Amino acid sequence: MGRTLYDKIWDEHVVHTEEDGTSILYIDRHLVHEVTSPQAFEGLREAGRKVWRISSIVATADHNTPTTGWELGYDGITDLVSKEQITTLDANIKEFGAAAFFPFMSKRQGIVHVIGPENGATLPGMTVVCGDSHTSTHGAFGALAHGIGTSEVEHVMATQTLLAKKAKNMLIKVEGAVTKGVTAKDIVLAIIGKIGTAGGTGYTIEFAGSAIRALSMEGRMTVCNMAIEGGARAGLVAVDAKTIEYLKGRLLAPGTDSVTGKFVGGPEWDMAARYWATLHSDADATFDAVVELDASQILPQVSWGTSPEMVLSIEDRVPDPEKEKDANKRGAIERALTYMGLEPGKALNDLYIDKVFIGSCTNSRIEDMREAAAVVKHIGQKVAKNVKLAMVVPGSGLVKEQAEREGLDKIFIAAGFEWREPGCSMCLAMNADRLEPGERCASTSNRNFEGRQGAGGRTHLVSPAMAAAAAVHGHFVDIRKFV
């Protein structure tokens, strides 16, 4: 019987399996940041242990890093707890070591799920873990990647393994071509809207179909990033020519000259590429669940509530809880409407916003910057007067550098956007970038829970194009009219 992509990677990394199904899984790559690592390093220190395989660790600071004030250096980190976590990471990596460390303000520093792939730390067929739930992002490369807790971070550091039980296989096929203006973010929001935030619970999802294959690697990362929001611990996309081409010349990838940083190929690259090409589900592989979507029917999406599954197309209206027969769902809708300050039946394109955030590990790569800048340039207007703040936060120093080479920063700044330094920023209320109570935000991030972007803040999840258009109009609009 054929095997799924998930089966193949799992089978190659299982060290031992108990009768109850609990397995010891070997971990290839461990991504580390400043929030979930301090306790793990301290645990190693107290036990007198060393990191088992230093070459597996790639570290950066991202959650707490400020996106302004870099001219002040570490003194620009105004929150003392944030500063302590960042300096503690510096000290821990100095003591324990890492294959690569991109500290605060370094050229390659950025969001861990952006810097991993762009530096070649994420390779097809790997098992990848990080103390962050959106580690599923790396599944775009045909890698088995998922988040782990702080105690597991220590366990992986000490043993290079993880205790896990194998999940079931789910296939989500998105066939056909999307219409103009519909992006990877819209595809994954539509998927979550269909299966719900618990639909993928107990599964590893493989995203497939012509619409997924048509996506760039950046787009595939966006889709896999939000697999966790659909309830799955991990999401995968099969390796193809786009995957392999993307990896050429990446800092830590095989075939890259360590001095020039350029792709030179060679036997190691050839062997790796041949293996990577096998990383797809067999034609006769069976899945425990299959979900299908027609890409042509997916419209630009906007979340309206306090869960990613509370999402509608821009043509829709805010739902009426009275029309929901299920009492639990009706109650959830009512609570969401109250928190979000919305009334049933209100058109989504009538929602005025206070702030705009373009960034996060979901949408802060160069393709996202280009997408948003193109919309701003095409519309040719400045940020609307009712919008208090519109900020663009590149996902890494390399993304920022590339965007500035292309002049994208000038487009944003001329239109009244703030062009920031890289970091997690307003995705979560853990740094200086946050919403005030009652403020409504068009955000390209991945979570719209109560208080996610700041106590009392109201988050609407959208694509970079939708966020950019909302910034200059002051409210949500159908992006298809402007592309």
Swiss-Prot record:
Keywords: 4Fe-4S, Amino-acid biosynthesis, Branched-chain amino acid biosynthesis, Iron, Iron-sulfur, Leucine biosynthesis, Lyase, Metal-binding. It catalyses: (2R,3S)-3-isopropylmalate = (2S)-2-isopropylmalate. Its cofactor is [4Fe-4S] cluster. Its EC number is 4.2.1.33. GO terms for molecular function: 3-isopropylmalate dehydratase activity; 4 iron, 4 sulfur cluster binding; metal ion binding. SUPFAM superfamilies: Aconitase iron-sulfur domain. One of its GO terms (biological process) is L-leucine biosynthetic process. Binds 1 [4Fe-4S] cluster per subunit. [4Fe-4S] cluster binds at C361, C424, C427. Pathway: Amino-acid biosynthesis; L-leucine biosynthesis; L-leucine from 3-methyl-2-oxobutanoate: step 2/4. It is an enzyme of class 4 (lyase). NCBIfam families: leuC, PRK05478.1, PRK12466.1. PANTHER family: 3-ISOPROPYLMALATE DEHYDRATASE, HOMOACONITASE, MITOCHONDRIAL-RELATED. Belongs to the aconitase/IPM isomerase family. LeuC type 1 subfamily. Catalyzes the isomerization between 2-isopropylmalate and 3-isopropylmalate, via the formation of 2-isopropylmaleate. Heterodimer of LeuC and LeuD. This is 3-isopropylmalate dehydratase large subunit. It comes from Polaromonas naphthalenivorans (strain CJ2). The gene is leuC.
